[in-house]
Amino acid sequence: FNGKLVIKPSKEGSSLGLYKLKNATLEEVKEAFAKSQEAGMTVLAEEYVFGRELTVAVLDMGEGLKAFPIIEIKAPDGDYDFEHKYYSDETVYVCPAEVSEDVTEKIKAVVEKAALSVGADAWSRIDVMLRDDGSFVLLEINTAPGMTPHSLVPLAARTCGISYEELVKQVAARASLKG
């Protein structure tokens, strides 16, 4: 145990109940577990991975599952919490992310396979941490990502020239094919 953990409820979203522990004592870990458990659900503990925070929308727009342009999330002090997701004007989203073509292609290939492997073959958004050496870690797959006009999936779609209305139609069409 090196004190670097992420503690979070298994079924929450938007970083609710999430604790990033950088140099935590065992007592601080126990406290984070207890707070995360207040929602009455299973708590997850993960390695705290440092790097650039990226996210990738993966959608089937009628031609098979494809990764959209990568988005880099630049939150103040690297803390992309609930406040910085929904209320801050300081968080910056760079789409497409400024990542080498080689790393971009590797990330896109891996997220497409990851989405298919969990049955998210219509749409999802996958969070990725990019390390300084070019290696990366998939953090989680969000199978029901935000879909407001200001959410990250529509941002990636707009970068490809796809309107919000067209995106919603395509996601709904894929859902009705499965339903």
Description of each model-found segment:
Residues L18-L21, Y80-F82, C95, M147:
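Short clusters of hydrophobic/aromatic residues that line enzyme substrate/ligand-binding pockets
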Residues L5-A32, E53-T55:
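Glycine-rich phosphate-binding loop of ATP-grasp-fold ATP-dependent ligases
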Residues E47, A115-M147, A157:
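Conserved metal-phosphate-binding beta-hairpin within the catalytic cores
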